[in-house]
From Swiss-Prot:
GO terms for biological process: thiamine biosynthetic process; thiamine diphosphate biosynthetic process. The gene is thiE. InterPro entries: Aldolase_TIM, ThiamineP_synth_sf, ThiamineP_synth_TenI, TMP_synthase. It comes from Caldanaerobacter subterraneus subsp. tengcongensis (strain DSM 15242 / JCM 11007 / NBRC 100824 / MB4) (Thermoanaerobacter tengcongensis). Binds 1 Mg(2+) ion per subunit. Disulfide bonds: none annotated. This is Thiamine-phosphate synthase. It comes from the Bacteria. It catalyses: 2-[(2R,5Z)-2-carboxy-4-methylthiazol-5(2H)-ylidene]ethyl phosphate + 4-amino-2-methyl-5-(diphosphooxymethyl)pyrimidine + 2 H(+) = thiamine phosphate + CO2 + diphosphate; 2-(2-carboxy-4-methylthiazol-5-yl)ethyl phosphate + 4-amino-2-methyl-5-(diphosphooxymethyl)pyrimidine + 2 H(+) = thiamine phosphate + CO2 + diphosphate; 4-methyl-5-(2-phosphooxyethyl)-thiazole + 4-amino-2-methyl-5-(diphosphooxymethyl)pyrimidine + H(+) = thiamine phosphate + diphosphate. Condenses 4-methyl-5-(beta-hydroxyethyl)thiazole monophosphate (THZ-P) and 2-methyl-4-amino-5-hydroxymethyl pyrimidine pyrophosphate (HMP-PP) to form thiamine monophosphate (TMP).
Length: 214
């Protein structure tokens, strides 16, 4: 797997995207600093997901940004995405790794050190750790706080991105005190002014990285 810049990892949710299609929203986010894109669209048909993924892949290829597909290994293979991200209710990381082979990116969600270590052992390339804070997108998600994310980061030897309720107002504190490699955001990027959200969050992330000496 090539080295990935996880600084600002955008996850799509069409419920936040108004007046444009997902590919257009993704392009705005990338132009303003997003370094990884995860296509995460629930409650749509496989055909619709595939067609959206094709359009988004055109955009990510244009800017040489990795495209990760949430859960759907078949869609990832169909559009030649760079990888797949799986959560606790999806296929196990080890199974996804076996299907995709050694060259694709496989990410796993973790709410605890034990889950993170298991994902790493099964072949995950990175961990999505959280939920850092309560979040509107997944209100049922377990909140582990900045300290919980820090423990996960310290336990594994692969990159960790913090996810869950992180936005431009708290990204600085999350990066500074958890030691993670980047921030993953849904509403923090796509809810409202995508350009401003992305620029503001990237500025806060870089400010924290600078203070950390990264």
């Amino acid at each position: 797997m090539k080295r990935i810049d996880f600084t600002l990892y955008a996850i799509t949710d069409r419920s936040f995207i108004k007046g444009m299609d997902i590919a257009e929203a993704v392009e705005i986010a990338i132009k303003n600093g997003v370094t990884v894109v995860q296509l995460r669209e629930k409650d749509i048909s496989s055909r619709e997901f595939y067609e959206i993924a094709l359009k988004v892949k055109e955009v990510t290829r244009k800017y040489n940004v990795p495209l990760i597909i949430n859960d759907r290994v078949d869609i990832a293979l169909a559009v030649d995405a760079e990888g797949v991200h799986v959560g606790p209710d999806d296929l196990p990381v080890g199974v996804v790794r076996r299907i995709l082979g050694p060259d694709k990116i496989v990410g796993g969600s973790a709410y605890s050190v034990e889950e993170a270590l298991k994902a790493e052992k099964e072949g995950a390339d990175y961990i999505g750790a959280g939920s850092v804070f309560a979040q509107p997108v997944k209100p049922e998600a377990e909140v582990i706080g900045i300290e919980g994310v820090r423990k996960i980061k310290e336990a594994v030897n692969i990159p960790v991105v913090a996810i869950g309720g992180v936005n431009k107002t708290n990204a600085y504190e999350v990066i500074l005190h958890s030691g993670v490699d980047g921030i993953s955001a849904i509403a923090g990027i796509f809810d409202g002014d995508i350009e401003a959200n992305t620029k503001d969050m990237l500025r806060e992330i870089r400010r924290a990285f600078k203070e950390r000496g990264k």
